[in-house]
């Protein structure tokens, strides 16, 4: 091989190496983006977890705001409200076990019987004023009254308003209604849950698929009524299932 041919070969090999390295870098970036896009439980709340481990005087109050209907409000068998057995406070109890130095507020802005359209109307006044560090939205169960389109519009409004304030957002799919077949994929409730899952993916935010968690538990041999206090409200055992799903982010 002559000197000229040798130089061409070396340059070609070098360019091949550069392109391969570039391709690897692009693939790595795409992989990183995909991890973030799915609201990965291991890292979505990383900045919040870093705050939760700080000790006085470096720590600050962390506000967890729960916006939704009667379930996060703590309604069991209406009109009985069992605040300390509902998932926001079961979550707080578990968080304090692993973050003993943290000051954590669980703030309820829920109203029993409310749907997402109603919740969106008071969102700025009743939710954003609490300056949430993490916002949980749980309206699917009651959104059957307003339909998919109105529900989506309302959820998107709240999501966008929260993200504009750099708030971490975690969406929750529905807890069960015993009048609805959990295994029927064509129900209005399942369609709403699917839409919520799509919104979480679209906006790269967190998702707790409570509906799927109940489906899996029942498919494994559980009895749905064992998790319910009335036809459409979970009992403490059902609330614990939701709290367990949220805890995976912490």
Task: Identify the residue ranges that each predicted region occupies.
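A short acidic, helix-capping loop that chelates divalent metal ions and anchors anionic groups
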Residues: 73-77, 117, 143-146, 178-182
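Cell-envelope and extracellular/periplasmic
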Residues: 71, 79, 108-114, 136-144, ...
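Structural beta-sheet core signal
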Residues: 66, 137, 171-172
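Internal alpha/beta domain cores that form substrate/cofactor-binding pockets in large enzymes
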Residues: 63-65, 102-130, 143-169
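Catalytic His-Asp segment of secreted/periplasmic serine-dependent ester chemistry enzymes
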Residues: 175-250
């Amino acid at each position: 091989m002559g000197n000229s041919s040798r130089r061409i070969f070396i340059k070609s090999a070098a360019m091949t190496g550069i392109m391969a390295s570039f391709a690897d870098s692009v693939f790595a970036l795409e992989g990183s983006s995909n991890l973030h896009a799915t609201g990965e439980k291991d890292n979505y709340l990383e900045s919040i977890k870093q705050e939760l481990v700080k000790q006085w005087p470096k720590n600050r109050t962390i506000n967890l705001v729960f916006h939704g209907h009667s379930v996060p409000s703590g309604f069991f068998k209406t009109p009985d409200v069992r605040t300390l057995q509902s998932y926001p406070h079961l979550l707080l109890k578990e968080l304090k076990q692993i973050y003993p130095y943290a000051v954590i507020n669980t703030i309820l802005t829920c109203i029993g019987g409310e749907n997402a359209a109603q919740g969106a109307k008071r969102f700025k006044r009743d939710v954003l004023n609490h300056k949430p560090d993490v916002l949980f939205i749980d309206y699917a169960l009651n959104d059957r009254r307003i339909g998919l389109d109105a529900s989506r519009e309302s959820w998107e409004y709240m999501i966008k308003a929260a993200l504009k304030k750099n708030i971490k957002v975690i969406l929750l799919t529905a807890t069960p209604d015993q009048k609805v077949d959990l295994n029927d994929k064509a129900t209005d409730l399942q369609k709403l849950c699917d839409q919520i899952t799509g919104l979480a993916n679209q906006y790269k935010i967190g998702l707790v698929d409570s509906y799927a968690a109940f489906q899996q538990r029942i498919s494994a041999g559980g009895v749905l009524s064992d998790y319910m206090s009335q036809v459409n409200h979970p009992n403490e055992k059902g609330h614990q299932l939701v709290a367990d799903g949220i805890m995976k982010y912490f």
